[in-house]
């Protein structure tokens, strides 16, 4: 990362050409640049139409400029914005003009957000929420990211940390006055009450995290079954485009095919697996092995078949739904959708899940004609809503959050051990405070910062 005393700039809007493009500038020379290229500084936070000229006074564009004096800006530094016409040549001319000034350079990925973090405009959990919002593909992911960006976890962690500091101060005061009667005991008692309540609150948050971390990556649905029963046709139907090769020859699919979908506002990854059967072909055997492995890891398995749906289903820890395909070949029998079909006993590893859709749901469809697909998709959406029910409102959205909160809870628990010396109680509380400080990005997180901010786009 370049020194933060340099002034940076970058395109902050989307791909060119476009109707409008916005170039953001942040740093100590932002005001100088704006004055040099437009003739004067506009009033703070006021859009002004300007003629933008380079250092030779050649006209670059007729645009709009805004000025935000630090620290009352997005980054906490002086910030200028150039709103120009979104042509590539216009942007190139403005970039050349900005680059001609000393101490001014293009920004690196995430550098604007990192400067905002370093200047106290947002904590690390809020920066992660911004990253999640930028990468959100579904409505549920967007809602979760907005809550994180709004300080859902950060505000709580700051309050917890303040309580730990207050309790530590009481305990250390008791240590200082240990030789004066029962002062230490009088100070220790309320501190331990605070610690116990705080531990219970963090433990409750950890217990309620549900599947919030999975909401960022999505639920996995595996389509499995024997060869040539229409698995590839089904995934093409669900994706509404051709993602898998469809052939009347059995064994066409040899590897796992994945497609990311938005079903009911939830992120769902659907995988098409090789047909599961006995084979002497080593390539097909590997495909079957991978199919069984992915089905075993899935959150929901659609076991596709035709006819009477006899035979073995895959062993999985998730629900397995029987989906009878090709009902269009049975002379129009049935309208498709959920049916009360007898389901063959599944492998011992299968389990029934709570909620409306368990491990014994069954459907009739025609993947080719689309018959019954509406009911199947609606059922998957309902399953996803139940699957992610607790994840949208949970505080924790990343493994990093969970790990640090677990560390803090463990240290608080140790500090509550009976007859633990006050000095050791204070040390455990100090370590718990450090864990929460790392959660907020205030303590020893340089490596984490580099990884997080590198995921942002250049203009963010």
Swiss-Prot record:
InterPro entries for this protein: AAA+_ATPase, G_TrmE, GTP-bd, GTP-bd_TrmE_N, GTPase_MnmE, MnmE_dom2, MnmE_helical, P-loop_NTPase
The residues that hold Mg(2+) are: 232, 253
What are its E.C. numbers?
3.6.-.-
**SMART domains, sorted:** AAA
Which residues are recorded as binding (6S)-5-formyl-5,6,7,8-tetrahydrofolate?
A: 24, 81, 121, 460
Its annotated compartments are: Cytoplasm
Which cofactors does this protein require?
K(+)
In alphabetical order, the GO MF annotations are: ATP hydrolysis activity; GTP binding; GTPase activity; metal ion binding
Keyword Transferase attached: no
| Residues that bind GTP | 228-233, 247-253, 272-275
| One matching Pfam family | MMR_HSR1
Kindly list the biological process annotations in GO that this record carries: tRNA methylation; tRNA wobble uridine modification
Q: Where is the TrmE-type G domain?
A: 218-385
The entry's cellular-component GO terms read:
cytoplasm
Report keywords, A-Z.
Cytoplasm, GTP-binding, Hydrolase, Magnesium, Metal-binding, Nucleotide-binding, Potassium, tRNA processing
Q: How is the cofactor bound?
A: Binds 1 potassium ion per subunit.
User: Which domain of life does this protein belong to?
Assistant: Bacteria
Matching entries from CDD domains are given as: trmE, TrmE_N
Its subunit composition reads:
Homodimer. Heterotetramer of two MnmE and two MnmG subunits.
Its biological purpose is as follows: Exhibits a very high intrinsic GTPase hydrolysis rate. Involved in the addition of a carboxymethylaminomethyl (cmnm) group at the wobble position (U34) of certain tRNAs, forming tRNA-cmnm(5)s(2)U34.
- What is stated as this protein's family in its record? Belongs to the TRAFAC class TrmE-Era-EngA-EngB-Septin-like GTPase superfamily. TrmE GTPase family.
**Do you know which HAMAP family this protein is assigned to?**
GTPase_MnmE
Report what the protein is called.
Answer: tRNA modification GTPase MnmE
Tell me the organism: Rhodopseudomonas palustris (strain BisB5)
């Amino acid at each position: 990362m370049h020194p933060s005393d340099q002034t940076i700039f970058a395109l902050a809007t989307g791909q060119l050409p476009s109707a409008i493009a916005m170039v953001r500038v942040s740093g100590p020379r932002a005001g100088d640049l704006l004055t040099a290229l437009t003739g004067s500084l506009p009033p703070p936070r006021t859009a002004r139409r300007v003629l933008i000229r380079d250092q030779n006074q050649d006209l670059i564009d007729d645009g709009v400029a805004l000025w935000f004096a630090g620290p009352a800006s997005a980054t906490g530094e002086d910030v200028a914005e150039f709103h120009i016409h979104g042509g590539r040549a216009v942007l190139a001319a403005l970039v050349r003009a900005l680059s001609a000034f000393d101490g001014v350079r293009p920004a690196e990925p995430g550098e604007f957000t990192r400067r905002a973090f370093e200047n106290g405009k947002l904590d690390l959990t809020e920066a992660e929420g911004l990253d999640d919002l930028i990468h959100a593909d579904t409505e549920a992911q967007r809602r979760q990211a907005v809550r994180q960006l709004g300080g859902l976890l950060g505000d709580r962690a700051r309050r917890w940390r303040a309580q730990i500091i207050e309790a530590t101060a009481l305990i250390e005061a008791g240590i200082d006055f240990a030789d004066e009667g029962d002062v230490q005991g009088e100070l220790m008692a309320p501190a331990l009450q605070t610690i116990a309540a705080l531990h219970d609150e963090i433990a409750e948050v950890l217990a309620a995290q549900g599947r919030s971390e999975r909401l960022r990556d999505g639920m996995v649905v595996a389509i499995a079954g024997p060869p040539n029963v229409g698995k590839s046709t089904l995934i093409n139907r669900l994706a509404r485009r051709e993602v898998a090769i469809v052939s009347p020859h059995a064994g066409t699919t040899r590897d796992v095919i994945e497609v990311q979908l938005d079903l009911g506002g939830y992120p769902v990854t659907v995988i098409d697996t090789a047909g599961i059967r006995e084979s002497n072909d080593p390539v097909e055997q590997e495909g079957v092995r991978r199919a069984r492995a992915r089905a075993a890891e899935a959150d929901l398995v659609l076991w596709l078949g035709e006819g009477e749906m006899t035979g073995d289903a895959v062993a999985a820890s998730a629900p397995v739904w029987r989906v009878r395909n090709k009902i269009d070949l049975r002379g129009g029998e049935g309208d498709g959708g959920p049916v009360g079909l007898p389901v063959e006993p599944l492998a011992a590893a299968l389990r029934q899940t709570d909620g409306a859709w368990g491990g014994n749901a069954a459907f009739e469809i025609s993947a080719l004609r689309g018959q019954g697909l509406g009911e199947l998709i609606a059922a998957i959406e309902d399953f996803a809503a139940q699957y992610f029910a607790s994840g949208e409102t949970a505080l924790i959205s990343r493994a990093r959050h969970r790990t640090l909160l677990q560390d803090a809870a463990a240290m608080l628990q140790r500090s509550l051990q009976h007859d633990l010396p006050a000095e050791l109680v204070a040390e455990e509380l100090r370590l718990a405070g450090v864990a929460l400080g790392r959660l907020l990005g205030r303590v020893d997180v340089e490596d984490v910062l580099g990884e997080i901010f590198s995921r942002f786009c250049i203009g963010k």
